Amino acid sequence: MAIKPILFNTEMVRAILDGRKSCTRRLVKPQPDEKHTYQLGFVIDSTEKKYVGCFGFGIDEYGGSIQYVKPPYGYAPGDILYVRETWERFECWNCEGDDNGNCPKNPQESVLNRTCGCYMYRATDEIFGDTKWHPSIHMPKEAARIWLRVTDVRVERLQDITIDEIRKEGLEPRFDVKDKFSDGIARGRFLELWNSTIKKSDLDRYGWDANPWVWVIEFERCEKPEGV
């Protein structure tokens, strides 16, 4: 069992906590050569250990040339992921407590009697005064509150996503739809989300219209492993 980090923005953290998100898509880097004619699939075992866990693209139908790409952090089914999210370490002396002066996370204790502090998360908590949030990429493993188990990893084109998979991404329509989350509305929401994660200078290569190859990583919530 490998334990690895994964980053999510605040909106997606809320979707995971709400039970709406069980899938994420990440860019394949580097993108396979456009001349490739078929996909070999994942390398399960090889005398060339560096290729194990990689996905192979064949450049011609006879396999004369193969391009290998590796999932981010080498994600594979069975891996345990800890979510890095926007966070802060809030010390007790900065906390006013609840209406009774008790710790919001441990109501049986007065904040005056606590010295350990606690981790706060932008997705669900508020901080006060001059305290500032730390970027998710800097969150230590010990601060992680969300743990995931990878159930599937595959490669596909971005625009191959279906309406059911868009739901698994944690997206919902921005307004009430009487009949259903229609395909057009769903794709529009996902298009906006995807393009918001891409630098403007890279939209022509990695944006929705470019239809890049992506890693599809499916997961489920799990408990923090013992001893971690």
Question: What are the functions of these language-model segments?
Answer:
Residues M1-V228:
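Secondary-structure transition motif
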